[in-house]
Design a protein with these regions (language model features):
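General small-molecule cofactor/ligand-binding pocket signal
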Residues: 108-113, 241
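Conserved acidic residues
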Residues: 206
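Short helix-loop capping/hinge segments that flank enzyme active sites or metal/cofactor-binding pockets
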Residues: 64-80, 129-197, 244-253
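Small-aliphatic-rich amphipathic alpha-helix that forms the alpha element of a beta-alpha
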Residues: 119, 195-198, 221-244
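Metal-centered catalytic cores of metalloenzymes
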Residues: 298-346, 350-390
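Short, surface-exposed loop/helix-turn segments at secondary-structure junctions
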Residues: 53, 180, 203, 212-231
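Structural helix-boundary/capping segments
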Residues: 1-76, 84, 96-101, 105, ...
Length: 390
């Protein structure tokens, strides 16, 4: 559940942006969501934003766990968020089937559209613009080794996947929050929220429904998630709950998102619980958790190469690597000079210009024995390895 902006305290959350940061529960069941929500909502003097929720918090969210909540519910199907590309069809089919299951439980489905939705989402996005200031302020106050986004980038010790967003944030003008563009985007956020609520009011809807993402989760490590619909809740401050909708033919889990009016978490909990109890789409992962995180063990190809590297830092860490371009697997055997218990992690870094392009962990602290293992390399990591930049 992503709660309404202002329902719960943000104190202690590493911030991305003032206009859309909110913390909510992630759980296996809707009942667990309601239990955690009861324990975490309300005013906190360390964060004045929950004052907006005064008078809007029920005595107990668990009271809305009702199996018949879908009966007579009116759900707006936000058709634009299903996408039209062939790659969108697989997820869309699963979510449409889930909506038919809601209909079978008594819900009425109404196809709806928010005027100029794509344009409004683009005009109201503030994630990268605010990141420089709010994350930077957090880093400065934390007393850690870096005190700004610029210093974080300079260290090269950020997750490689964040390179793009951190670059954009770092290039935001220092006076941006006092400028006209920021004011326009704030106004656009208000306009977007009003447009969504108008659609819900005009059609007497209890919620909107759409895929959490339009496409299936990508194959790691080189895939990037495409087609996220998370921006609507984030940029309006309205609550949204993702519920298991089923699985693709290939066994990939798919979620349906239910969006409600501000502080309508009780409604979302009821609808989600009713759907969950009727369908039981969630099932435990098919893996045990004991499998290796690296690529499967295979005989090395003819073009496999081995090389030695010694990393220096607080400790000396000599390592032997084996790279097989056939499988893109990078095997490693690390023999640190200190006890493995004293090492928090060993990382691969990709050099970009004069700084690193972020880091990817190849080793987490695993025990007292010298670690060996393997991981698959992403496309940019393979290219960096071949040019001496990994």
């Amino acid at each position: 559940l992503r709660p309404s902006l202002g329902l719960s305290s943000r104190a202690g959350i590493i911030p991305f942006g003032h206009t859309q940061d909110t913390g909510g529960p992630l759980a296996r069941t809707v009942e667990d969501i309601a239990i955690v929500l009861d324990a975490t909502v309300g005013f906190d003097p360390a964060d004045p934003s929950p004052a907006a929720s005064n008078g809007k918090i029920p005595r107990a969210y668990t009271a809305f766990l009702k199996r018949n909540a879908l009966k007579s519910a009116r759900i707006g199907v936000l058709t634009e968020f299903f996408g039209t590309a062939p790659e969108d069809r697989e997820v869309g089919d699963v979510v449409r089937h889930a909506l038919e299951e809601m209909k079978a439980q008594g819900a009425t489905l109404i196809d709806v559209a928010v005027p100029n939705l794509s344009t409004q989402l683009q005009a109201s996005n503030l994630l990268t613009q605010e990141l420089k200031f709010y994350l930077g302020d957090y880093l400065k106050k934390s007393g850690g080794p870096v005190a700004s986004v610029e210093e974080l980038l300079g260290s090269g010790l950020h997750a490689a996947q964040l390179q793009g967003i951190l670059d954009i944030a770092n290039n935001t003008p220092d006076d941006y929050l006092a400028g006209d563009d920021y004011k326009r985007r704030l106004a656009a956020r208000d306009a977007l929220a009003k447009a969504v609520i108008k659609v819900m009011d005009d059609n007497r809807l209890d919620s909107l429904a759409y895929p959490v993402t339009r496409r299936i989760a990508p194959v790691l490590p080189s895939g990037n998630q495409i087609g996220s619909n998370a921006g609507l809740s984030a940029q309006t401050g309205m609550p949204a709950m993702s519920v298991p909708a089923g699985f693709t033919v290939g066994g990939v889990p798919v979620g349906v998102e239910l969006l409600g009016r501000p502080f309508a978490e009780p409604t979302l909990i009821g609808l989600a619980y009713s759907f969950e109890q009727a369908t039981r789409h969630r099932r435990p992962p098919i893996f045990s958790g004991r499998e290796s995180a690296g690529p499967p063990a295979e005989p090395p190809g003819a073009d496999a190469v081995a090389f030695d590297v010694t990393a220096t830092g607080a400790f000396t860490v000599p390592a032997r690597f084996r790279f097989d371009s056939r499988t893109r697997g990078l095997g490693f055997d690390i023999q640190p000079s200190a006890s493995i218990d004293q090492i928090g992690g060993v990382y691969l870094a990709r050099r970009v210009k004069r700084t690193n392009g972020g880091v990817a962990p190849i080793l987490a602290k695993t025990g007292p024995t010298p670690p060996t293992g393997a991981r698959s390399l992403a496309d940019n990591e393979v290219a960096a390895l071949k040019t001496g930049k990994l």
